[in-house]
């Protein structure tokens, strides 16, 4: 790798100094870098080999969604709290990371993403892509949602809950975990359906093959009360007769790993920080 695009979350402490250090480490090794705060616009930089984010998991997830259609791999420097997805912590390992990237000694994990399409009046209205999860949740009115879930056209269940999470394996350690869902090995090809605070003890998470197509419709008729949210920061309002279709996306996120490590080791290390 030679050309890098650096993305920093300006709200995190120490980002500017870390960006300066990272740019210096790349330049002294003969690399080229561009940098930005916030969302990525790579149309003017078609030759970028790698995107490096400085922030938390949220910064990496937003960047991964921005570039997933371009096939550019991404790596994150954790400047936040847990950092499940970022590869190094703080700025102390920047030199080590740059050496590995410049010398092409890394490897890439391809993570599946979910395509969430709102179907309105029989037509595709809006499609969002999620690396972690797609969530159907209530909005202004704090009332229970009643959602009908279908798998490959077959009725699964009517969930009475605060919402429904459809998660990727990558997202299994995020909102899904907080809602009582299982942890799934991140390189697997699965989708998880997890109700949020269900009003029945029998309503629990279900794990599906990523080849399945999920449709969710609504039994209630609460006006302007629900929305589809992906990865916690992109959303679309849902109407009573809308149907949400969820399937494995044709695109994926390529996460760079500096060394091969156990998924379980990573989970243990992160859990100990909570």
Task: Name each region found by the language model.
Residues 110-114, 130-132, 143-147, 162-164, ...:
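A generic structural signal for short beta-strands and their flanking turns/coil linkers
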Residues 57-59, 82, 170-172:
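Short glycine-rich anion-binding loops that position phosphate/pyrophosphate groups of nucleotides
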Residues 53-57, 65-66:
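N-terminal glycine-rich "phosphate-gripper" loop used for MgATP/nucleotide binding
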Residues 71-73:
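Proline-centered loop/turn at the N-terminus of a beta-strand
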Residues 1-50, 54, 90-107, 117-128:
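ATP/NTP phosphate-donor binding region
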Residues 82-162:
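Catalytic core of DAGKc-family lipid kinases
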Residues 158-161, 166-202:
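Gly/Ser/Thr-rich active-site loops/lids in small-molecule metabolic enzymes
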């Amino acid at each position: 790798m030679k050309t890098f695009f650096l993305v920093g979350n300006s709200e995190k402490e120490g980002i500017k100094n870390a960006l300066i250090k990272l740019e210096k480490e790349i330049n002294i090794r003969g690399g080229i870098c561009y940098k930005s705060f916030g969302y990525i616009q790579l149309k003017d930089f078609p030759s970028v080999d790698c995107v490096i984010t400085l922030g938390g998991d949220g910064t990496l997830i937003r960047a991964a969604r921005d570039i997933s259609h371009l096939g550019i791999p991404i790596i994150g420097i954790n400047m936040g709290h847990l950092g499940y997805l970022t590869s190094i912590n703080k700025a102390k390992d920047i030199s080590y990371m740059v050496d590995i990237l410049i010398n092409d000694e890394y490897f890439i994990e391809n993570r599946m993403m979910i395509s969430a399409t709102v179907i309105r009046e029989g037509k595709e209205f809006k499609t969002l892509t999620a690396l972690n999860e797609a969530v159907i949740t209530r909005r202004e009115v704090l009332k229970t949602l009643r959602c009908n879930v279908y798998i490959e056209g077959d009725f699964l269940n009517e969930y009475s809950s605060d919402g429904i999470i459809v998660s990727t394996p990558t997202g299994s350690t995020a909102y899904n975990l907080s809602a009582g869902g299982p942890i799934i090995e991140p390189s697997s090809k699965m989708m998880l359906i997890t109700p949020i605070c269900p009003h029945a003890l029998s309503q629990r998470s279900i794990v599906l093959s990523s080849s399945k197509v999920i449709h969710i419709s609504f039994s209630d008729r609460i006006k302007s009360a629900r929305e589809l949210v992906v990865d916690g920061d992109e959303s679309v309002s849902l109407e009573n007769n809308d149907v949400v279709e969820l399937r494995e996306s044709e695109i994926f996120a390529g996460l760079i790993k500096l060394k091969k490590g156990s998924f379980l080791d990573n989970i243990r290390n992160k859990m100990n920080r909570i």
